A protein has these predicted regions:
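Positively charged n-region of N-terminal signal peptides that target proteins for export
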Residues: 1-6
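Bacterial N-terminal signal peptides
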Residues: 7-17
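Aromatic-Pro/Gly-enriched surface loop or interdomain linker
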Residues: 19-80, 84-87, 185-186, 192-224
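Extracellular/periplasmic catalytic domains that process cell-envelope and extracellular macromolecules
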Residues: 21-24, 73-77, 103-104, 161, ...
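Short alpha-beta junction capping motif
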Residues: 28, 80-119
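An acidic, glycine-rich "communication" segment
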Residues: 35-36, 44-45, 118-194, 202-211
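Alpha-helical scaffolding within the catalytic cores
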Residues: 63-70, 92-98, 162-166
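Hydrophobic/aromatic-lined pockets within catalytic cores
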Residues: 107, 129-130, 218, 222
Length: 224
């Protein structure tokens, strides 16, 4: 009886473990920066995006995103950094060098302008890559044509200045290393529904475009 009980316990343990969700394969980290801008804006965005991607893509993202500082070696633990906010962005010389090394080594940075970042984030990234210029991505770029097809480029999620959304990129040796989404506000669309009260179809477009970015970076990146 003792042997049978032990075997039953082992079988039950195996059965339970077989239904346990797999450990997250990777995390999207939120980038903390200096200068006074609210790097912590849209706190529910990344968890909600992770949940959407885990349901709709063959992927397993940690739903609890870590926060990393621009100058920390910890950024090298995460293949994808997300940066957002409304205001000033400042990188010290050491932070700029750390970010440069990270991006050259294969890391990816998504900057989502939450409104008001543009005058600050461009000089900050110029400090990281003085030799590079942001290039507007054409609607034909693969990031718009992953699982979800966006024939006209970025969707407009949150209205501010009646301007069209634009996607800009920094390229290093033919690889898109930084995607800057401007006048779009994807992160607002990823927030909990009751935060901005965006229409559900608008939120779905935001999630779908976010999923495209994730799929492009991890599953289908091709810039050539």
């Amino acid at each position: 009886m003792k042997i049978l009980s032990t075997l039953s316990l082992i079988a039950l343990t195996i059965l339970i473990s077989s239904f346990s969700p797999p450990a997250p394969s990777f995390s999207i980290a939120l980038l903390k920066y200096n200068g006074g801008g609210d790097w912590y804006a849209n706190p529910t965005s990344l968890p909600n995006l992770a949940e959407f991607c885990n349901k709709n893509l063959d992927i397993n993202i940690n739903p609890d995103p870590p926060t990393v500082e621009a100058g920390s070696p910890e950024i090298f633990n995460y293949p994808f950094l997300h940066m957002t906010g409304h205001g000033n962005v400042v990188f010290s010389a050491d932070e700029a060098q750390n970010m440069r090394t990270y991006l050259q080594a294969g890391g990816f940075l998504h900057i989502d302008d939450n409104y008001g970042m543009d005058p600050y984030v461009r000089p900050a990234m110029k400090k990281v890559f003085p030799e590079l210029e942001f290039i507007e991505l054409p609607f034909s770029h693969p990031v718009f044509h992953q699982k979800y097809d966006f024939k006209n480029g970025l969707p407009k999620i949150h209205e501010h200045d009646n301007k069209s959304p634009q996607a800009f990129g920094l390229f290093w040796e033919g690889r898109l290393i930084c995607l800057y989404t401007f006048e779009c506000d994807l992160g607002d669309g990823w927030e909990d529904a009751d935060v901005h009260k965006d229409p559900e179809d608008t939120r779905q477009k935001a999630f779908q475009m976010g999923a495209n970015i994730i799929q492009y970076v991890f599953m289908g990146r091709s810039d050539l």
